Structures are given as structure tokens and as C-alpha cells.
Curated annotation (Swiss-Prot):
Name the UniProt record assigns to this protein: Protein hunchback
Matches recorded under SMART domains: ZnF_C2H2
A biological process from GO: segmentation
This protein's UniProt keywords: Developmental protein, DNA-binding, Gap protein, Metal-binding, Nucleus, Repeat, Zinc, Zinc-finger
GO molecular function: DNA binding; zinc ion binding
Function recorded in the entry: Gap class segmentation protein that controls development of head structures.
ZnF C2H2-type span: 1-5, 11-33, 39-56
Subcellular localization(s) per the UniProt record: Nucleus
Gene: hb
GO CC term, one of those recorded: nucleus
SUPFAM superfamilies according to UniProt: beta-beta-alpha zinc fingers
Similarity comment text for this entry: Belongs to the hunchback C2H2-type zinc-finger protein family.
């Protein structure tokens, strides 16, 4: 938690300048660089990289 206050961001993306305080945030960010759309709508052809994009 203290990393949030200190400004220290030890996790860095190797594809852009993104930095963050924890590994899970980096893993989520790395999806933005991929072409994998693993979450699909059951009612249409929409697909997304992030599960929260399917929620109402």
C-alpha cells in the first residue's frame, strides 16, 4: 500500500512507458498490447480484452 504514496513504480511495461505499483496492474495493462479478445458477448459477435467491458 505504501508504494501508492511514495510514487515508486517498480513494474514497467517493456512495450511502452507505462509504470505501476503492482504486478496485477501490469498484467492488466499488457492486454492492451495483445490481439487476444477472450471475452465474448453471448448475444452478438462483440469481443473484448477486458471482462468489465461486458458488464451492464
Amino acid at each position: 500500500h505504501l508504494r501508492n504514496h511514495s510514487g515508486w513504480k517498480p513494474f514497467r511495461c517493456d512495450k511502452c512507458d507505462y509504470q505501476c505499483v503492482n504486478k496485477s496492474m501490469l498484467n492488466s495493462h499488457l492486454k492492451s498490447h495483445s490481439n487476444i479478445y477472450q471475452y465474448r458477448c453471448a448475444d452478438c459477435t462483440y469481443a473484448t480484452k477486458y471482462c468489465h467491458s461486458l458488464k451492464l
